[in-house]
């Protein structure tokens, strides 16, 4: 008999959590698990899940929000009717509460982000309340990085409740030299340019301005650098204006949102992450590692776990654009260092960051929690 699992996600757009869930469900063991996904009506994720063979169930109220009492009522009715063995709520508090009220045996909360807790959340009474309700509503918590786990324990959650399962991605296609040259030409990249790339939302937490300021420092002494920014967001016009103001717009290309970043990653010589908030384990960094791209990342959140300084890339102090520029120039100027970092990037990816490893670890946890819950139910039945 297969284990019935409901995955609940409140995202309206296709973000990191949605991509991870799509990847994992596409690789899941269909003989062992009967999975269903619940998303908001109108979410851009609907077609993506249909493309991998799932017909989503829709929420009405939790659209890019974690809590709505009306959704608790709706989900509670659904869970009582369908009787899932496991509910995994990807940040959706309403789903956790509904699963508790519906007496779902295994209730999981997956934490996809990391951020500095507000001061009031560190007060002892608040931490005690968070600890209590976390145990009440959740059987287990999955953190997608050590940084996410620390974030949770900092606000009082019992570390024994938390299982760290690092984000994994499917390896991207590595282009041949001939195809790479053709794609670089099609994208308008100057010949012999050293391409520094970043794939991220254009929001403050992603620190794109740090890369732009580092670009100005580098271009003062060497015009061979070229910068590609893949993504869109609310800071698009501000960042373009900053690039113009610094006089480097001819060497910085804003590529916009790209559903498939494979061509861009293949054009990069180095893959950069400038996060100053929320980062746990960057999917773009992992995808770049799968084709041997050295990484340069800020020391924020989960970046230092993914990027081992001097092994598969370099770590610089968050927001320090001078240090970022120095890391870029060192990797560019030292070909032996570049080759070593590139080789180790692939090893780092294969060691822990593959989609299949993430999927199998999650399924193993599901099976263990299901077995424990089943044994507990049998013991309670005998006791009665």
Q: Which ranges hold each PLM region?
A:
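Membrane-interface segments of envelope glycosyltransferases acting on lipid-linked substrates or membrane lipids
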Residues: 1-384
